[in-house]
């Protein structure tokens, strides 16, 4: 049987460019363990240009093939795409829209689901509509005195807030505010990352994560894992990826009752189904001291770096990542 030509896209040129490259290496290693696939890895730069690993410029055409600027290199037919791009344009749904247009099968959530989850305001509206509890919030559409006043009122009610750019990933443009006088400055910074901002009540809680994915026709939700940070810190971009980070992860969270685990898994699957996610996701929750469960956010293309939770939780659940990938791709292509 002929091999499946898999195009692995990474980079994107945004704040998570380097993280995307690390995740792509995990895909390369996993795909190499199977003789089903022939893989071409391309990096997308800030200018929207694709590069091979040798530095050759190329493009993905509407004929579903890669054409190289060097005319001596023959076009490469594409059967399937893995858009391993964190943030824009991968998790925002933009690149998936192009794949839909040229009828090219791809791994991961479709464009509408990706967009709905990436925008924190839209996502929270969906959570509430689906009956999944989430953190109290307000949202703002421009930086002005009214926005400052609304945020100050929320701060006065809640005592502490998170101010988040509505359409960024990996805690980019996300700030914890404990001092009222800092609100205006932080709001201005957040609006520098996105045209909309969400202000959330700070929740003192455990940070739990669930890998939710499709395998052999079933939707799987793993046992919750846990992110453990220093006291009074949140899981910022630096805490995630800095070499001197004090944060640690537990693939299976300790001291959770079976009832709580089941409730968290039920909410995760409810969100996965209700928002019409596909193939994979990492769904993050808060668990308060009173055992209140709050959905924090959904990551439609979770990181696959050495510290990332998704592949560890999948493996802990008893599934091999290469076999999982092969199953998803084969089911989609009908092979």
From Swiss-Prot:
GO biological process terms held by the UniProt record: cell wall organization; peptidoglycan biosynthetic process; regulation of cell shape
Enzyme class: ligase
Textual note on the cofactor: Binds 2 magnesium or manganese ions per subunit.
Annotated binding of Mg(2+) 1, by residue: 284, 297
Pfam families cross-referenced by the UniProt entry: Dala_Dala_lig_C (PF07478), Dala_Dala_lig_N (PF01820)
Keyword field: ATP-binding, Cell shape, Cell wall biogenesis/degradation, Cytoplasm, Ligase, Magnesium, Manganese, Metal-binding, Nucleotide-binding, Peptidoglycan synthesis
Any single GO CC term annotated in Swiss-Prot or TrEMBL for this entry: cytosol
Top-level taxon of the source organism: Bacteria
Binding site for Mg(2+) 2: 297, 299
Function comment: Cell wall formation.
PANTHER family: D-ALANINE--D-ALANINE LIGASE, D-ALANINE--D-ALANINE LIGASE A
Family affiliation: Belongs to the D-alanine--D-alanine ligase family.
Protein name: D-alanine--D-alanine ligase
């Amino acid at each position: 049987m002929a091999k499946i030509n898999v195009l692995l896209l990474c980079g994107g040129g945004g704040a998570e460019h380097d993280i995307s490259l690390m995740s792509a290496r995990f895909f390369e290693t996993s795909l190499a363990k199977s003789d089903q696939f022939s893989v071409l890895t391309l990096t997308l730069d800030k200018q929207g240009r694709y590069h091979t690993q040798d530095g050759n410029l190329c493009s993905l055409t509407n004929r579903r093939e890669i054409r190289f600027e060097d005319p001596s290199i023959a076009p490469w037919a594409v059967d399937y795409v893995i858009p391993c791009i964190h943030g824009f344009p991968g998790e925002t749904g933009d690149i998936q829209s192009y794949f839909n247009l040229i009828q090219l099968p791809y791994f991961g959530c479709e464009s509408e689901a990706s967009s709905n989850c990436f925008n924190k305001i839209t996502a929270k509206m969906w959570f509430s509509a689906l009956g999944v509890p989430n953190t109290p919030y307000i949202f703002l559409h421009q930086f002005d005195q009214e926005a400052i006043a609304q945020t100050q009122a929320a701060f006065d009610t809640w005592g502490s807030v998170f101010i988040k750019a509505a359409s960024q990933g990996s805690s980019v443009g996300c700030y914890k505010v404990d001092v009222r006088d800092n609100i205006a400055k932080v709001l201005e910074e957040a609006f520098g990352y996105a045209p909309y901002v969400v202000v959330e009540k700070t929740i003192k809680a455990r940070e739990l994560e669930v890998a939710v994915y499709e395998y052999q026709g079933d939707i799987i939700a793993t046992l919750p894992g846990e992110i453990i940070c220093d006291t009074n810190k949140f899981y910022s971009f630096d805490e995630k990826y800095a070499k001197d980070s004090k944060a640690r992860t537990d693939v299976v969270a300790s001291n959770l009752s079976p009832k709580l685990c089941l409730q968290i898994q039920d909410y995760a699957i409810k969100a996965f189904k209700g928002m019409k996610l596909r193939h994979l996701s990492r769904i993050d929750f808060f668990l308060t001291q009173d055992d209140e469960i709050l959905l924090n956010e959904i990551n439609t293309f979770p990181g696959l770096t050495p510290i990332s939770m998704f592949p560890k939780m999948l493996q802990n659940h008893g599934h091999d990542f290469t076999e999982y990938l092969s199953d998803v791709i084969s089911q989609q292509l009908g092979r």
